[in-house]
From Swiss-Prot:
Pfam families: Flg_hook. It comes from Buchnera aphidicola subsp. Acyrthosiphon pisum (strain APS). The gene is fliK. The lineage of its organism: Bacteria, Pseudomonadati, Pseudomonadota, Gammaproteobacteria, Enterobacterales. The keyword Membrane does not apply. Controls the length of the flagellar hook. It comes from the Bacteria. This is Flagellar hook-length control protein homolog. InterPro entries: Flag_hook_Flik, Flagellar_hook_control-like_C, FliK, FliK-like_C_sf.
Length: 235
């Protein structure tokens, strides 16, 4: 009986030792982790481990972190905008020189589009540019006794600069076709709503011009038909 009691005590002692060792291991592991990453119960700060071995840390104020994303977005937007301007500039600059073949061809195409609109009695013209990021050129045309007043609207300052250098070429092109360029104005429409309104007005005017032309053509054909029709008179 005494021997059985000793065995029980020994087992209890061994179990306690094992439990203590296990607990000590857990504590050691926790201490190790705690040494690597310090936990701060403070909502105003966030700690990011930079180097766990050396236990180096970067501390950010959470209020400032909220400001970082808008700053990055703003810088990114500025970079995109800057790249877009450089991209447009890279396309426009080769056309600025009047000596280049491409510049002359471009000027001829714009002049042809304007002359075509005038001959069709359109009061507006739209010139598409390639690449599409250059936008379009909208031209308002006012004609009276073969005297033209033109207004150009572009989306980019670089295109406006090109149009400024293009005006003498257009003046000569119109003059060769018996049209005098009395006045011209070149402006930039950077506001989306303003440009959208102008586009809507452009297509609306084109629709009404086409409609009037079709009506006039139909009336002319009807008059010609009446003129050509012979009437036989029997007595």
């Amino acid at each position: 009986m005494h021997e059985s009691s000793n065995i029980k005590k020994k087992n209890d002692f061994d179990f306690k030792n094992l439990k203590n060792k296990t607990l000590q291991k857990k504590i050691n592991v926790f201490d190790t982790i705690k040494n690597h990453i310090k936990i701060i119960n403070n909502e105003e700060k966030i700690i990011l481990p930079l180097n766990i071995k050396k236990n180096k840390k970067i501390v950010f104020d959470s209020k400032n972190i909220n400001k970082i994303n808008p700053m990055i977005s703003k810088r990114h937007s500025c970079k995109i905008l800057s790249n877009k301007k450089e991209f447009i500039k890279s396309y426009i600059e080769p056309f600025m020189s009047s000596d280049t073949k491409n510049s002359i061809e471009w000027k001829k195409l714009i002049s042809h589009k304007i002359l075509l609109s005038i001959s069709n009695k359109y009061n507006q013209a739209k010139i598409h540019l390639k690449p599409e990021s250059l936008g379009s050129i909208y031209v308002s045309i006012s004609m009276k006794n073969n005297i033209a007043t033109l207004k150009f609207i572009s989306e980019h300052n670089e295109v406006k600069t090109f149009l400024d250098s293009y005006m003498p070429f257009l003046y000569n092109s119109l003059k060769k076709n018996g049209i005098k360029l009395k006045e011209f104005k070149i402006s930039i429409s950077s506001k989306k709503n303003q440009l959208k309104n102008y586009k809507n007005l452009f297509y609306k005017n084109i629709y009404y011009t086409d409609h009037i032309k079709k009506t006039l053509n139909w009336n002319e054909k009807k008059i010609d038909y009446i003129k050509d029709k012979t009437i036989d008179v029997y007595v």
